[in-house]
Amino acid sequence: MAVVVKLSGRIFEDEELVLKYAEAIKSYGVKIAVVTGGGELARRYISAAKRGGASNTFQDLIGIYASRLNALLLISLLGDAYPKVPTNIEEFLEAWRSHRVVVAGGFQPGQSTATVAALVAEAAGASVLLNAANIDAVYSDDPRKNPKAERLPHLKYDEFERIVRSSSLPGGYELMDVWSISILRRNCITVYIFDGRRPEHIGAILRGENPGTKITC
Amino acid sequence: MAVVVKLSGRIFEDEELVLKYAEAIKSYGVKIAVVTGGGELARRYISAAKRGGASNTFQDLIGIYASRLNALLLISLLGDAYPKVPTNIEEFLEAWRSHRVVVAGGFQPGQSTATVAALVAEAAGASVLLNAANIDAVYSDDPRKNPKAERLPHLKYDEFERIVRSSSLPGGYELMDVWSISILRRNCITVYIFDGRRPEHIGAILRGENPGTKITC
Amino acid sequence: MAVVVKLSGRIFEDEELVLKYAEAIKSYGVKIAVVTGGGELARRYISAAKRGGASNTFQDLIGIYASRLNALLLISLLGDAYPKVPTNIEEFLEAWRSHRVVVAGGFQPGQSTATVAALVAEAAGASVLLNAANIDAVYSDDPRKNPKAERLPHLKYDEFERIVRSSSLPGGYELMDVWSISILRRNCITVYIFDGRRPEHIGAILRGENPGTKITC
Amino acid sequence: MAVVVKLSGRIFEDEELVLKYAEAIKSYGVKIAVVTGGGELARRYISAAKRGGASNTFQDLIGIYASRLNALLLISLLGDAYPKVPTNIEEFLEAWRSHRVVVAGGFQPGQSTATVAALVAEAAGASVLLNAANIDAVYSDDPRKNPKAERLPHLKYDEFERIVRSSSLPGGYELMDVWSISILRRNCITVYIFDGRRPEHIGAILRGENPGTKITC
Amino acid sequence: MAVVVKLSGRIFEDEELVLKYAEAIKSYGVKIAVVTGGGELARRYISAAKRGGASNTFQDLIGIYASRLNALLLISLLGDAYPKVPTNIEEFLEAWRSHRVVVAGGFQPGQSTATVAALVAEAAGASVLLNAANIDAVYSDDPRKNPKAERLPHLKYDEFERIVRSSSLPGGYELMDVWSISILRRNCITVYIFDGRRPEHIGAILRGENPGTKITC
Amino acid sequence: MAVVVKLSGRIFEDEELVLKYAEAIKSYGVKIAVVTGGGELARRYISAAKRGGASNTFQDLIGIYASRLNALLLISLLGDAYPKVPTNIEEFLEAWRSHRVVVAGGFQPGQSTATVAALVAEAAGASVLLNAANIDAVYSDDPRKNPKAERLPHLKYDEFERIVRSSSLPGGYELMDVWSISILRRNCITVYIFDGRRPEHIGAILRGENPGTKITC
């Protein structure tokens, strides 16, 4: 069983959390491809670049470099990961053939790391994508504003896409975007969205549980 | 003045047309970045791959290889183009610094060549993108079905996006997609859509004319 | 047992045939290195390039790109092939160490894909090269012109080279050239030439049969 | 005149400072090679890696990635810098031939960025290295502990090396190490050490002033 | 005027000679592409490899590495050469666009450096190839054996090819082979063969003289 | 058990010796990383470069190319070595994951091959480094000058470093330098220094003997 884990860049703000994710990944014997976001590091550097007049292209490249630094940190904590951070899908494919774990950051400007995670899932032939997100599940509305917002443990892709397009979901773009959704949907990949502060959910999901939201086609 | 020219892959079905585009590009002294689609060649190979069970990832890679073959053909017809086909935005940036003309195909799965053209325009700091398309202009409706369809020589991005989202525009995805539109819009790049069978329109546009549709922010 | 299969580019004109070759390669458990020619695709693009004044260097590079597109198509149809198209012999060697199947196109201008196949056979330590050719066997004369032309099921390298040098053999250069012959001969690699429209001959040859011509040192 | 500027990684903690250095580099028309350290970013990530049991090799690679992120940020703020971060001296040489400004981070484990700056100075044929340091000059003793410490505006390499070897100099290793000193000395490169919080000192030094310490052979 | 200079590897046995060639290349302001052979260094290493059972592939690769070491030495003696040794024709093309001098060694197994020189001449659009050879001119027969051997200052390609094919020419294969001859002939490149121990002949040839043998189409 | 073997470049002056080392490496089933020096070949080429005014950077690069030619020769004599010469630590790490034997030369200017051997030992997680040196053991003084010099079969790192820093040890820099010593010490890697003309000592050391000097932390 091959799974893809998308780690929100925010996880890398918390050293403890990164170490726990490394432990989790080491402990489960499945083939795992991890995609890391750039997080606060990326935002900080992009903000400085923007202030100084950098082009969007360079802002994107900076975000990618930040995500790769996060990826390399995770690699350094694992024993058997491919020792480099692949920079495009062909490098990923090559590494995936002979390593149990491969960790990537961004690939190219114009693609969010959520999209990269979806492309990696497609390339890896993974049937499952675990999204360690900034929210603990998908809700019908922003639970921080609307106490009546309904927690949605199961969604079909159509429903999920509708919610993502609306602006009521916190995390918005960083959770998923319509592009990544379309790639995942066309391969009928099941997505689990769970609270990124809870690495133990990876084990729970691999055992068949659903600690957050499960999206199917 | 730096311009980007997006050449629909269909142009490469017609040897005469390719030769004329080469002549046009050689004759105008401006800095030009060209992005070539995969065309019928890509479609044919992708169809064979699909039949044989190839993954979407490989189908995309095949389309990219086809677009790069088209790009190389064009390079071979120009005297002063960067002699290689850049495979990502950093290679493009590097080549663009020291060559008047750079010709690219696709970069990575998950990005249409329309998106690549938009990213290249952004990276090149181009103010204008010329789209040698499969239609001669943008219409309010499909002119082949509705004789009353109105030819639209000038559009704002909002209007253009609305039309693209609707299914009434022939060419649809291959013309532009919402992703490329958003990249172009955020850099306020002017887009000219014209009949790809008329290479002479490049000169017309450079002279300030508008033979098809002009889209501005 | 490691074998090399040289696929004439013409095979890629026929979708059915490509799919059958993929099946054949998947079914035999031996280590296989495949080298694909550029075929009609290459000829068409080279012709356009030549018309437009492209240098011989670029014409050769175009032929190489075409052969690599064919190679990638084949890779996409196999499950366990090295996922990239090696571009030189060192990349081939690296891939060959850890993959059952590796598919290459051309390497460098100045080398026919027949020569590349010979170099790959040498590098792979293969004892056998299967040439899926445009003719079904080697004849003493062009059988299409001379009905008395003798079919030659067994040849020594000397005899084969004499026939290749003479102009009576259809296919001529695309079959083999003196350079590839000398590389094969110095490693004493056995060559089987068979009808490229008959993928089932691969299995026959692996079972010890000789459906066309067998060349030994 | 070609100069090398070594920017302590700490500069990248201060967005204002980075923007000012970008302005300074843009304003002086000389050929400039910049080498950026990893700073606090590197230390933070290396510390996390170390906690999790990462090898020294990976700790070094993480430091290098951090320094390259800093380098890329600086590149994004300049208009005419080589658009990539060279990863070794040959890439640097290639970029240096055709760009006024090149910005590098670390190259390989086992080399401090101070050493990289020295190697780059040697490769670039620079006669001057400007070290934007964590101290404002070299002192005979640690001025923070010994109020009688003497500020040393001029030093010969011998004297400087003696001071670096002793532990009384704050900044120690990050300022310079004996390896970088030997490389600089053998090429008789003049080093200016100045307060890294004062980008305007670059201009002063280029005008012939000495705001901190000047080291000559 | 662009010229290609082929330097026999034997030149690199003589330090004085290498230094003189560097001076010659520096002094003439024309665009020069140099291709260096592996010489005695290659022969010694290949012999050791062969003794130890190395494959032909590796023997060829060793010869290529040796030729590249020679190339790098020459680069180090020139001020404005492309700072790297291109490893294939595309790298050569890229370097040739922006450097007055480019120095290459071998490219791939299966190609003599004479062939590489011919391919480089074709790619560079050079009209002239200067072959600093192991003989001082072409003779009708081996002058060391037949005192009546006629020195041939002018030859057409047909005549030259006939002589090369016969075994009477000393140097034989290392001078030129039929493959390089065919590439040179199809581009109508003029070849000058002269005594490799006389670097001053380069200047003579550039001035219109013919110190050895001149071959034209 | 993973070991690193550092082969002095002088070994490559003696064809017999190289063949014996190849045999030794093939016969022991352990994972071995080999680092080869440039030897006399490097010295000869560097001397020529220096005479002609080459920069230190190019002198170092020439030394690296020479060491890589030696590495390739050794690779060609082994059956299962990674088929390429890694050029930096990341390439080494990648190769080391899937090959029993990897052979490298130098990586970057500014690092002796002794330092590269130490970095490779650190990256490979090796506990032992075997240094096939130009001396048969470490002595308290130069045994060629002082007949009373004491042979030292066992040393701690402190003692060894003291001896290396003093000028009394023949071989000096080429044996080890303080930089490599510090890398080895921080990983507590045991070093065996033995007579490089005696390949059979590798087997002896693997069997637990100490034919020369053993250095521990």
Curated annotation (Swiss-Prot), chains A, B, C, D, E, F:
Presence of the UniProt keyword Ion transport in the record: no
Catalytic activity: UMP + ATP = UDP + ADP
Record keywords: ATP-binding, Cytoplasm, Kinase, Nucleotide-binding, Pyrimidine biosynthesis, Transferase
Single GO term (MF): UMP kinase activity
Chief subcellular location: cytoplasm
Domain of life of the organism encoding this protein: Archaea
Positions of UMP binding: G38, D60, F107, Q108, P109, G110, Q111, S112, T113
Enzyme Commission number, as recorded: 2.7.4.22
Keyword Lipid metabolism: no
Regulation of catalytic or functional activity: Inhibited by UTP.
Entry-linked InterPro entries: AceGlu_kinase-like_sf, Asp/Glu/Uridylate_kinase, Uridylate_kinase, Uridylate_kinase_arch/spir
Subcellular location field: Cytoplasm
Binding site for ATP: K6, L7, S8, G9, R10, G39, R43, N134, Y139, D142
Similarity remark: Belongs to the UMP kinase family.
Designated name of the protein: Uridylate kinase
